[in-house]
Amino acid sequence: TLLLVAGGSSDDIELGAIGSDTTSSIRRERSPASKTKNILLLIGDGMGPNQVALARFATGGPDHRLSFENFPITGIVYNHSADSLYTDSAASATTWATGVKTKNRYLAIDAEKKFLPTIPELLSTKGYKSGLVATSSITHATPAAFYAHIDSRYKEKEIAKMLVDSDIDIALGGGQEFFDVTVSQDNPFMIYDKKLLDSTLLNSKEQVIGLFAEDGFDRRLGTPTQLEMTQVALNFLENKSQSCAGFFLMSEGSQ
């Protein structure tokens, strides 16, 4: 499994780290002939160097290192958009999802409004499954850049329809107010209740959309955590990937 960690701060400095499914204390040798099967992209909304330093101090002191800081490859990029020195979530997420810079507010289209294929769409043609997790609305700019092609991140009802028709196999987050689809047993299998985050139930479905808040999460209301949703999404994708090439999962700690 290939693990990617990325974040964006108000200064538009984004951190990137690439690692395997090993830890610094237990490192397994990989055969030169082996290939990465699964890809995990973890995004920290607003996560710049200052936020990383604070997390380091809070969890272990100034000499502590977070797990991704021990990855074999780390880097910093200045991710300006196509029309501004200051990017927004839509333009920066489009860059992650497609490899192409675009204008602020645009999702998975270039500066001339031409369609840009996303990672999940490209992988789908090769037999991969894909999933998205966010603590914002699942129609918010960052997750939406991986499935929606539209000229405004704020057209969230249209973005919601694009998710239903997309190649995303499991999407967990908020955003009930943007979806017209009612809770149903149909495809996609829609759930609004945290109690239905059950792998035994979900693994029998082909496409799952879980919406646990009207918009973004308010943790005081008992919404599921990012960890809980990510674990469910991983179980779902691992179950599906037994009969396919592998999977891609993006999980964002939003807002």
Please name every model-derived segment.
Residues 1-3:
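Hydrophobic membrane-insertion alpha-helices, especially the h-region
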Residues 7-9:
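N-terminal Sec signal peptide cleavage junction
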Residues 12-207, 214:
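N-terminal catalytic scaffold of extracellular/periplasmic and nuclease hydrolases
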